């Protein structure tokens, strides 16, 4: 309901589809949406991004056959929303969500093929939903290099986020964000060296 009200308020403030479409084209790198596009498109982003997160969590719960809504998951919804003025929007977050879901299905299937009985890192498990929240920090990279790399980096985050605590002994409470930073440290220099950004690809086609 809160997110629907955000959308209604954005429309009342004069936000148009064209305005929000411009925001969705933004890579999300080093940007403040409310300053660059205005308060109405930013508020529209809060509403649509919020509904997208809730829909994803409900889908994850339906797939797993469990109720995913706990105090922790309510908290991480708002944690994800905290980035919707500083770079995150549905256009650069959906590949991360898709990457998490595909990786969960893939490794869950491999686990069963190897004779495992209970795969603990399913898409609706709390640890994976929390991991997804902080994988959201990869969204500017997705916006800059495209959905394929977003899904690949999300898969790497999924695989590392539950293993990285062994590296720091549980002393880093911001583990998901630390994992996202570690992935950026490993992958972004390679992307900058060997891959073209979406803008560079468009310029080549023009």
What are these regions (language model features)?
Residues 95-103, 149-159:
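Central hydrophobic cores of alpha-helical transmembrane segments
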Residues 56-120, 124, 133:
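Conserved mixed alpha/beta catalytic, RNA-binding, or beta-rich assembly cores of soluble enzyme
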Residues 80, 101, 133-140, 155, ...:
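Transmembrane helix-bundle signature of multi-pass membrane transporters/permeases
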Residues 1-59, 122-123, 145-150, 159, ...:
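Signature of multi-pass transmembrane helix bundles
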Residues 14-23, 78-91, 139:
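C-terminal ends of transmembrane helices
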Residues 106-110, 131-146:
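Short helix-perturbing small/polar motifs within transmembrane alpha-helices
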